[in-house]
């Protein structure tokens, strides 16, 4: 596959009708009768049926196959807090993937609100429109509480894609990579660079699959997450290590079997990859720029099992695979 350039990406989004999604009718509309059934006066009848039995919304409207992809733009890909509007191309892209891979219709909704309570209120207010909510690109730790509350307070499915979608697909990749490497998950040493929603959820699923907490080292922007630190939230405390001999990624990666990167680009050097155990597994999943490029990782050592989140490199680990 050819490398994706800035020019090609901008042209793809702007050529023809701008954007990537549209709304199309599902019923006939060519005659006056069709239009009278679609809207007034015919539309009153399904309204009255739904008033009597709200479940009939699934019979008479698109609700059952309509998902809201909702974001406030505070953690967009590896770009960070770029704002609700700037994140819209990503939400449209997720809508496109829902449609082509799962046949699910999507409205992308960008909410310009960082306060968790107000964001929750906004989602709850529009929830009757949808059959499901897909939370997207919301920063940690707020995303954990937002998802928990919405699951408790809404009567439709709620999923935070960055947590659960990434966890499912990266875990599948890890299981396969361990088979190739001839290693067992309960024995491998795992280094996780990043401590946001995706990293936490991925690592929790690794633990449920058999990885041992004592074999896991997680890092955030301040370095190794250790029990000596006093600035940790609940999610980070769960993964805090007892080790006092490591503080940086360079120190933590020595002898590791697995590297999971959900942080930012170009933080893993070739020397770090060389310092890992035989047949190391490197999942450099930062987007759009991986923690180390595929070319650099493969050049560092021939036995590396390498994956990224990009579709223009081999071994893509991306939520879309789960659709």
Specify the residue positions occupied by each region the protein language model found:
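Glycine-rich phosphate/diphosphate-binding loop of Rossmann-like nucleotide-binding domains
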Residues: 77, 84-102, 160, 164, ...
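A short, aliphatic-rich alpha-helical micro-motif
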Residues: 127, 185, 252-253, 273-276
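N-terminal ligand-binding/catalytic initiation module
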Residues: 1-156
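Short alpha-helices
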Residues: 163-176, 308-323
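Short, ordered loop/turn segments at secondary-structure junctions
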Residues: 72-74, 82, 111-112, 137-140, ...
């Amino acid at each position: 596959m050819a490398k994706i350039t800035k020019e090609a990406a901008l042209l793809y989004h702007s050529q023809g009708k701008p954007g990537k999604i549209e709304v199309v009718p599902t019923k006939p509309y060519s005659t006056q009768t069709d239009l009278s059934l679609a809207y007034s006066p015919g539309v009153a009848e399904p309204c009255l049926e739904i008033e009597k039995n709200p479940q009939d919304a699934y019979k008479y409207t698109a609700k059952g196959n309509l998902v809201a992809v909702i974001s406030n733009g505070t953690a967009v890909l590896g770009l960070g807090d770029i704002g609700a509007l700037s994140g819209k191309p990503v939400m449209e892209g997720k809508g496109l993937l829902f449609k082509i891979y799962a046949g699910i219709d999507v409205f992308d909704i960008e909410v310009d609100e960082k306060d968790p309570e107000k964001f929750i209120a906004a989602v709850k207010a529009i929830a009757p429109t949808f059959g499901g909510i897909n939370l997207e690109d919301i920063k940690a730790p707020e995303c954990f509480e937002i998802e928990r509350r919405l699951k408790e307070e809404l009567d439709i499915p709620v999923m935070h894609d960055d947590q659960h979608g990434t966890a499912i697909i990266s875990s599948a990749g890890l299981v396969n990579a361990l088979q190739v490497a001839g290693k067992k998950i309960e024995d491998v040493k795992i280094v996780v660079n990043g401590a946001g929603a995706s990293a936490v959820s991925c690592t929790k699923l690794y633990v449920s699959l058999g990885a041992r907490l004592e074999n896991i080292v997680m890092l955030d922007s301040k370095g190794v997450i250790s029990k000596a630190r006093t600035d940790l939230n609940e999610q980070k405390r769960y993964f805090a290590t007892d080790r006092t001999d490591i503080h940086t990624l360079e120190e933590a990666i020595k002898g590791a079997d697995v590297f999971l990167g959900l942080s930012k680009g170009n933080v893993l050097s070739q020397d770090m990859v060389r310092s890992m155990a035989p047949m190391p597994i490197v999942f450099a999943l930062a987007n759009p720029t991986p923690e180390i490029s595929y070319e650099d990782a493969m050049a560092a050592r021939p036995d590396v099992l390498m994956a990224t989140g990009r579709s223009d490199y081999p071994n893509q680990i991306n939520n879309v695979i789960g659709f």
